[in-house]
Amino acid sequence: MKTNLRQSNQAFVAAALVSAVAPAALAVDPHMGGEMKHVMVWRDGASLETMIDETVPLPILTNYDETYAGAASVLNGTWYNSQYGWVVEGFWEVPPGASIWIERLSGTPGLLSYSGGTMTTPAFTPIFGTAGSPARIIWDGRMLHNWYAATEPGPYQATYKVYFGDAGGTPLNGYMPSIVTLEWHLYCPADFNRDGYINGNDYDGFASAFEAADPAADFNGDGYVNGNDYDGFASAFEAGC
C-alpha cells in the first residue's frame, strides 16, 4: 500500500465537536464492501479463460461491528466482503451434457466462503470447503457474488479452477480449465475511504466525518465521536501501513 503523508495536521475544536453516537444496531443486510469486481469467464475453443477486472482496487475484508439475522448471521463477528462476482463474458455455449464448475484448489487458512445465492444453493450456504462443504460448486452462468469472510483481519487469497464438468463435477476430457486467484487486502485503519492508498483524501474524509459527528469517525469503536478518535486516526495516518 502506498503512503503519502500530509505534512500538516488539521486542527479541531474539541468542545464543539464532541458528540455521542448510538451503538451499532441490528443491520438489515450485509455490505458488499465496495464496487463490484468481476471475474470474467469465457470460452475460447476447447478452453475456458478467466480475467479479473483490475480497474477496481483489491477488496478488503471488513468488520462493520454489526449483527445480522437469519442465514446472514454466519457473518456476525467476521471480516467479510462480497465484491468479487463471477460473470460470463460474451456469448458462448457450454458443451453438450456439461456444466460450468468452480473448484477451490487452495487458499489462506481461515478464509470462509458462503454462497451468494443461486437457483440450487440458498444465500449464505457454506461452500468451497467451509464447514465441511464440497470444494466445488456448479455455476449456472448468472452473475454470482459469493461472500468471503474471516474471523481475523489480514491479507487473504484463494485459487480456483473453472472447468467444464459432468453432472457430478468430473472434468470433461478434451477441455482445458482456467486457474484464477482472488485476493483481499490487509485492512488498514488509516485508509478511511478504502481505496487501497493512504493520502490526503483519507485525512479530509475523516475530518469531514468527525466534524459531522458521523459514526464512521468513531475510530476507536467506543460508541462516541470525540478527540480520542481524532488523535487515534492522526497517529494511524502518520504511521502508514
Regions found by a protein language model. Give the residues of each.
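Contiguous segments within soluble domain cores/interaction surfaces
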Residues: 27-145, 161-187
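Short tyrosine-centred short linear motifs in exposed loops/low-complexity segments
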Residues: 144, 152-156
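Bacterial N-terminal signal peptides that target proteins for export
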Residues: 2-13
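Short, charge- and proline-biased low-complexity linear segments
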Residues: 156-172, 216-225
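Bacterial N-terminal signal peptides
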Residues: 13-22
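Cellulosome-associated attachment modules in secreted, modular CAZymes
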Residues: 187-241
